[in-house]
Amino acid sequence: FLMTYGDGLSNINLNKLLQTHNQKKKLATVTAVPPIPRFGAVRVSNNLVNKFNEKPKENKNLINGGFFILETKLFKKINLKKNVMWEQEPMIKLTKKKQLAAYIHKGFWYPMDTERDQNYLNELLKKNAPWLKK
């Protein structure tokens, strides 16, 4: 089944997400996305800044994009406790058991965690909402 946090907008191709999940044959697949360049990057050595990059566009790290495909049998396999945060104990257990695959999405993804995010996404909606493009 599909699961999402519901606090992000994206043009994720759900068919490709499902295809990756089926190919990897794991209990869960997470959508991995590049982080948005919201903050500047600071490289520090011996308490001295040796590089500063304001809102870098390139970041080789990926973050949890909040869109998942889960097998129903995973609830029996990883013994989940009640009232646990999905991105903590369950995802850590799945990772340790090598049962968490990743679908890498390089298209549009943006969180809506703050009023600032909401305002930005509303402006995009008025112009040309990239999450509505095929």
Q: What positions do the PLM features span?
A:
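Catalytic-core segments of class I nucleotidyltransferases/pyrophosphorylases
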Residues: 1-2, 9, 18-22, 34-37, ...
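Small/polar loops that bind or transfer phosphate-bearing groups
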Residues: 5-6, 30
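Nucleotide and nucleotide-moiety/phosphate-recognizing core
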Residues: 14-16, 25
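Short aromatic-enriched loop/helix-cap "lid" or pocket-rim segments at secondary-structure transitions
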Residues: 15, 41-43, 115
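Residues at the starts of beta-strands that form the adenosine-phosphate
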Residues: 27-28, 99
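Short beta-strand-to-loop element that shapes/binds the nucleotide-sugar donor at the catalytic cleft/hinge
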Residues: 28-44
